[in-house]
Amino acid sequence: RGIEYRREPVEYLDVMFDGKPLPAMFSKAPGDGPKPCILHFDGLDLMKEIIYAAVADEFRRRGISLLIVDHPGVGGALRLHNITSGPDPERPAAACIDYLETRADVDPNRIGIMALSLGGYYAPRAAAFEKRLKCCVAWGAIFDYGVAAADRLTGKGGEPSVPAYAEHLHWVFGTKTQDELL
């Protein structure tokens, strides 16, 4: 609601992925013509509205549009559509790029990806397999989530970021046992 009250230039939309909607926000860079665009994926316990509040103005000031997506395992994709995270973040990234390529206000030759925390693993993997991505920013990457999750579950990894951490991980990844999760 705060975005509505501030009258910010954002468009709420769904990007279709495997026949299901990934909730997203598109923040258009000012000016005419196609602009570069960053696709933003979240971490384990974030959602698009938090990222929008943190970075959208900075991208707009630099003439870069931003597509922030609740990708599989995150935010509305998980809570509203039960889309769990999989081992192949390049697939939802490809769906997002397919969508961006339909927009006249996006330069299809200047699409990049950025993500933080667990998303810092997703973004490089997506960029490695999805050749249409021209840049990649891994913001606080977790390169082996199995080790990080095991440490947190056994109390060695610091405080969990969400209550009922083990249950949250099972929900995000669609697993039932710790062996499946790790």
Regions found by a protein language model. Name each.
Residues 35, 40-47:
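Active-site glycine-rich loops that stabilize anionic/oxyanionic intermediates
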Residues 44-57, 71:
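The serine-hydrolase catalytic nucleophile loop
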Residues 59-76:
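Conserved alpha/beta-hydrolase
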Residues 70, 110-112, 135-137:
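Residue in the alpha/beta-hydrolase core beta-strand immediately N-terminal to the catalytic nucleophile
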Residues 83-109, 125:
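Alpha/beta-hydrolase active-site loop
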Residues 115-119, 123:
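Gly/Ala-rich beta-loop-alpha elbow adjacent to hydrolase catalytic centers
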